[in-house]
UniProtKB/Swiss-Prot annotation:
Protein name as it appears in the record: Uncharacterized protein MG422
Source organism (scientific name): Mycoplasma genitalium (strain ATCC 33530 / DSM 19775 / NCTC 10195 / G37) (Mycoplasmoides genitalium)
Tree of life domain: Bacteria
C-alpha cells in the first residue's frame, strides 16, 4: 500500500505519493516558505536537470538492469554514485520556524566522524608500515606543510579571540568612542576568521586532490635494487656458514645436519600436537558432562515444587534422558578420543542415539497430553513409568544400537590413532636415516680425504667472500671519482679496504679454518658498527655530488624546474643534452660554493692565496673529468637507480622525522587549544549572537578536526581494499565540496559556524548534505520533456518497484500530470481531513 503524505502551508500546496512532487524548481527561494518539510529516507541515484535524451538513457539503463540502484550514471558530465538501500519507514523532520535551532544535530565535524583524540593520534604513525608507504612521501611533506600552516592560523585565531574578548568584556566603563573602536576591531576579527577558513579549506582541497596523483615508479626501482643486494648478502652469509661447518667437521654433512634439525622439530611438533589434542578432548568431554550433571540437578530441584502429574512425568523423562547421555559420555571418555573434532562428531551421534531410544516414551507422552482423564490415560502413565524403570545403565548398554555406536566410535578412534602414530614413525625414521648417512660420510672422508684440506683449500673457502669485497671496492672507487664531494663513500672505501688488508695479513699457518672464519666475521661486524655510527651521527648530511646538486640546488628556483625535466626525460635521447645543460652549467656557475666547502673541511682558508689557487685548479680538473664520466655513465640504468635511491633515502629520513614530530605537534596543538579555551571560559563575558564563546571554541577545534580527517585519508587509501566504505565516504566528501559551488553555496561554509549562515542558505546546505553526500531521494526536474515511453516506464516503476525496493522521488510537476494520473488526494495534517 502506497503511503501518502502532504505538507503545505498557506503559501503553496504540496502533494506526495511516498514521494514529494514539487511544483516550483528545486532549491528555489519560494521553496522556503513551507513551515515544515518531511523527507522519507530511501537510497537511490541522484539526478538533476534531466532533459529528453537523458530520460531516454535513464529508462534504458533501468530496463536492462531491472534493478535501478546499481552501477554508475553519468548526467551532464557528472558522475553520481549509487548507495545502499535502507529502510523506507523512517522519517526525519526539519522545523524551519525556529531560527535559533540548528539544522544539523551538532556541527559538521560530527558528520565528518571526527571522533579522534590525542591517544588515538599519538599511535597513528606507529602503525604505519614504512616500506609500503614510501610512495606517499610527497603526501607526508604536504601534510607537514599543512600542519605548520594550520598551527599558525589557529594560534593567530586564539590570540585574537583572547585579546578581543578581554578588551570588550573586562572593562567596567565603556564610552561610545571606545565601544566603536572595539566593535570595529571585533568585526575585523570576524572577517579574519572567515578569511582564514576560506584559505584553510582551499588548502585542504588542494592537499586532498594531491592524494590521488602520486606515482610510485621511483620506488619500484629502489626496491628491486634493495632486494637484489639483500639476497646477495644472505647467500654470501649462508655459503660462509656452510664452508666453516664443513671445514670443522671434515665432511659434507651440513645439509644432512640441517635436515636432522628440521625432522627433529617436526617430530617434536607432532608429539606436542598429539598431547595437546588429547588434553583438549578431555577438557571438552569433562565440561560437556559437567553441564549435563548441572542440568540434572536443576531439574531435580524444580521438581520439588511441581504438583501436576504431567509436569512430574515430564521431569522424569528429561532426567532419565540426561542420565543416559551422561552414561554414553563416560563410555566415550574411556576410549581416549584424541581429536576434538572427532569427539564432537561422536557426541552428536550419541545425542541422536538417545533420541531414538526415548522415541517410544516421547510418543506416549504426547498422547497423554492430548487425552483427557480416564482409564486409558492411567494405563499410559503406568506404561511410561514402567519403561523408565527398565531404563537402567545395564539395560541401555546391552541394546544393539548402543553396541553399534560404541564399536563405530572405537573404530574411528583407532583410525585417528594409527594416523597420528604413522606421522610420528615417519619423522623418527627420517631422523635415523639421516644420522646413518652422516656416519657413512664421516667414515668416507676420514684418512683418504683428510689430506685434501690444505692451506690452498682453506684459502678458496673465502674466495667468494673476498671477490665480493673487491667488487664493492671497485664500485665505490668509481662512484667516489664520479661524486667528488661524497664523504660517505670515503668511509665505505676505508671500510672495505681495511677488511681486505686484514685478510691479506692473515698467517694461514697459524690459524685453523674455523678460527679464521670467526676472526673475519668479528672484523666485519666491528667495521659495520663504525660505519653505522657514522651515519647515525651525520644522519642529515648531504651525500655525493648528485645529492649536492639535488639538495643544495633546491634553494635555486630555476634549478627545481630543471630537476623535474631531468626526471621526466630520464629515458629519452635528451638525457645527455640535459646533463650538459644543467649539471655542468650549475657546477661552473656555483663553483665557489663546493670549493669553499672542501677547503673549510680540510682546514684551509677560503682566501685566494697560492695554495688555494692550486687546490681550485686541481678541483677544476676533477670536475672536468666528472663531466665526461657523467655523459658516459648516466646512461647506465643502475646508476640512475642509485641516484634515485639516495634521494629516496633522504625522503625516508624526512618521513621518519615527520613521524616523530607529528605526535609532539598534535599534543602541543591540543594543549594550546585547551589552555586558550579555559582562559576564554574564565573571562567574564556577555553571551550574545555577535560573540558566542561556544561557537568560537568549536570553530577553533574544527580546524584541527578537518586536518585530522585529511590525515586519516592517507591510511584509507593505503588500505583501500579493506576500507571501501571509508574510501567511498571520502569520495562523497570531495563530491559535496565540489557540488556546493555549483549550487551557489561557498565551500567554506561546510567548515564554518552554521549560525553565520542565513535560513535560505542553511536549508540549501542541509539538502545538499542529505541528498548529495548521502542521497536518500531521486530528484527529477522537467517532467514535461520526457517521451510517452519513458513516462509510462517511470509510471510502472513507481507502481511495481516502489514498495519492493523503497524508491523515493522528488518531481517538479507544474501541470499535475502525475497527480491526475495517480488520483492522489491531499492530506491536511493539522485537521487530518482529505481534500
Amino acid at each position: 500500500m502506497l503511503k501518502k503524505i502532504s505538507l503545505f502551508d498557506n503559501l503553496e500546496q504540496w502533494v506526495d505519493l511516498s514521494l514529494l512532487m514539487i511544483r516550483t524548481s528545486f532549491l528555489d527561494a519560494n521553496y522556503f516558505g513551507v513551515a515544515k518539510l518531511s523527507l522519507f529516507k530511501y537510497g537511490n541515484y541522484l539526478i538533476d536537470n534531466l532533459n529528453q535524451a537523458q530520460w531516454k538513457t535513464l529508462s534504458q539503463v533501468l530496463q536492462l538492469n531491472k534493478q535501478p540502484y546499481s552501477g554508475f550514471l553519468l548526467v551532464n558530465n557528472h558522475q553520481y554514485l549509487p548507495l545502499q538501500k535502507i529502510k523506507f519507514n523512517l522519517c526525519e523532520e526539519i522545523d524551519l520556524r525556529n531560527k535559533n535551532k540548528w539544522l544539523f544535530p551538532n556541527s559538521f565535524s560530527i558528520f565528518l566522524k571526527q571522533d579522534l583524540s590525542y591517544k588515538k593520534d599519538q599511535n597513528y604513525f606507529n602503525l604505519v608500515n614504512i616500506p609500503k608507504q614510501l610512495k606517499w612521501f610527497l603526501g607526508f611533506n604536504a601534510l607537514n606543510d599543512l600542519f605548520r600552516f594550520s598551527i599558525l592560523k589557529i594560534e593567530n585565531v586564539n590570540q585574537k579571540t583572547s585579546k578581543v574578548i578581554n578588551q570588550f568584556f573586562t572593562s567596567k566603563f565603556i564610552n561610545s568612542i571606545y565601544f566603536e573602536q572595539v566593535d570595529f576591531e571585533y568585526n575585523n576579527f570576524l572577517t579574519l576568521i572567515e578569511k582564514n577558513e576560506r584559505e584553510l579549506v582551499d588548502f585542504n582541497c588542494m592537499f586532498f586532490n594531491q592524494l590521488f596523483t602520486f606515482n610510485n615508479k621511483v620506488i619500484k626501482s629502489f626496491f628491486e635494487r634493495y632486494y637484489a643486494l639483500n639476497e646477495q648478502k644472505n647467500n654470501l652469509k649462508n655459503k660462509l656458514k656452510i664452508a666453516a661447518y664443513e671445514a670443522k667437521s671434515r665432511d659434507n654433512s651440513y645439509f644432512e645436519k640441517l635436515q636432522i634439525e628440521r625432522a627433529k622439530q617436526r617430530l617434536f611438533d607432532a608429539k606436542k600436537t598429539f598431547s595437546k589434542q588429547h588434553k583438549n578432548a578431555l577438557q571438552l568431554i569433562n565440561s560437556f558432562t559437567f553441564s549435563l550433571i548441572f542440568s540434572g540437578w536443576k531439574i531435580k530441584w524444580r521438581s520439588f515444587f511441581n504438583f501436576y502429574r504431567k509436569r512430574i512425568l515430564e521431569k522424569k523423562i528429561v532426567s532419565k534422558r540426561i542420565k543416559t547421555r551422561i552414561l554414553l559420555l563416560k563410555e566415550i571418555k574411556k576410549m581416549d578420543l584424541l581429536s576434538p573434532k572427532l569427539l564432537v562428531e561422536t557426541i552428536d551421534e550419541s545425542i541422536n542415539l538417545v533420541n531414538k531410544i526415548f522415541a517410544n516414551i516421547q510418543n506416549l507422552y504426547q498422547e497423554i497430553i492430548s487425552l483427557k482423564s480416564g482409564p486409558n490415560l492411567n494405563w499410559k502413565y503406568q506404561t511410561i513409568n514402567q519403561e523408565l524403570k527398565i531404563m537402567s545403565a545395564r539395560f541401555i548398554l546391552t541394546k544393539k544400537e548402543v553396541h553399534e555406536f560404541l564399536i563405530k566410535a572405537r573404530l574411528s578412534f583407532i583410525k585417528n590413532f594409527v594416523k597420528q602414530s604413522n606421522n610420528l614413525y615417519v619423522h623418527e625414521k627420517l631422523v635415523n636415516e639421516l644420522k646413518e648417512n652422516i656416519l657413512l660420510n664421516q667414515n668416507h672422508y676420514r684418512g683418504k680425504h683428510n689430506n685434501s684440506f690444505s692451506v690452498l683449500i682453506q684459502k678458496t673457502v673465502f674466495k667468494q667472500f673476498i671477490d665480493t669485497v673487491q667488487y664493492a671496492i671497485g664500485l665505490i672507487s668509481m662512484r667516489k671519482s664520479l661524486e667528488t664531494f661524497n664523504f660517505a663513500f670515503q668511509i665505505k672505501q676505508y671500510f672495505y679496504e681495511s677488511l681486505l688488508a686484514n685478510y691479506q695479513k692473515i698467517n694461514w699457518q697459524k690459524y685453523e679454518l674455523n678460527n679464521l672464519y670467526f676472526v673475519l666475521i668479528s672484523l666485519w661486524n666491528s667495521l659495520s658498527k663504525k660505519f653505522q655510527q657514522f651515519f647515525n651521527k651525520y644522519e642529515f648530511l648531504s651525500c655525493g655530488s648528485n645529492d649536492f646538486i639535488w639538495n643544495e640546488g633546491r634553494s635555486e628556483p630555476h634549478f627545481s624546474l630543471l630537476k623535474d625535466k631531468l626526471k621526466n626525460d630520464l629515458n629519452s635521447p635528451k638525457w645527455n643534452f640535459l646533463v650538459d645543460k644543467v649539471i655542468n652549467k650549475y657546477l661552473d656557475l656555483n663553483f665557489e660554493t663546493p670549493v669553499s666547502f672542501l677547503l673549510a673541511s680540510r682546514g684551509f682558508s677560503s682566501t685566494t692565496d697560492t695554495t688555494n689557487k692550486e687546490t681550485k685548479n686541481d678541483l677544476k680538473q676533477k670536475l672536468k673529468k666528472c663531466k665526461q664520466k657523467y655523459k658516459l655513465l648516466l646512461k647506465d640504468i643502475n646508476l640512475v637507480k642509485w641516484i634515485f635511491r639516495d634521494e629516496t633515502n633522504q625522503k625516508l629520513q624526512k618521513i621518519k622525522f615527520i613521524m616523530k614530530r607529528y605526535c609532539i605537534l598534535n599534543k602541543t596543538l591540543h594543549l594550546r587549544l585547551k589552555k586558550t579555551n579555559k582562559k576564554i571560559k574564565r573571562t567574564f563575558f556577555i553571551d550574545s549572537e555577535e560573540c558566542n564563546i561556544n561557537r568560537l571554541e568549536a570553530s577553533n577545534k574544527l580546524y584541527l578536526n578537518v586536518l585530522n580527517s585529511q590525515l586519516k585519508t592517507i591510511n584509507f587509501f593505503l588500505r583501500s581494499q579493506k576500507n571501501l566504505k571509508k574510501l567511498n565516504f571520502i569520495n562523497n566528501i570531495n563530491l559535496l565540496i565540489n557540488q556546493t559551488k555549483k549550487n551557489g553555496i561557498s565551500s567554506w561554509m561546510l567548515f564554518s559556524d552554521l549560525n553565520k549562515i542565513n535560513k535560505n542558505e542553511s536549508l540549501k546546505l542541509y539538502l545538499l548534505f542529505k541528498l548529495l553526500l548521502n542521497p536518500k531521494l531521486l530528484m527529477i526536474n522537467c517532467c514535461n520533456d520526457f517521451t510517452n515511453h519513458a513516462y509510462n516506464f517511470i509510471r510502472g516503476l513507481l507502481i511495481s518497484y516502489q514498495n519492493k525496493q523503497g524508491i523515493a522521488l522528488i518531481f517538479n510537476d507544474p501541470n499535475n500530470k502525475l497527480v491526475k494520473n495517480f488520483s492522489i488526494k491531499n492530506i491536511d495534517f493539522e485537521t487530518g481531513m482529505k481534500k
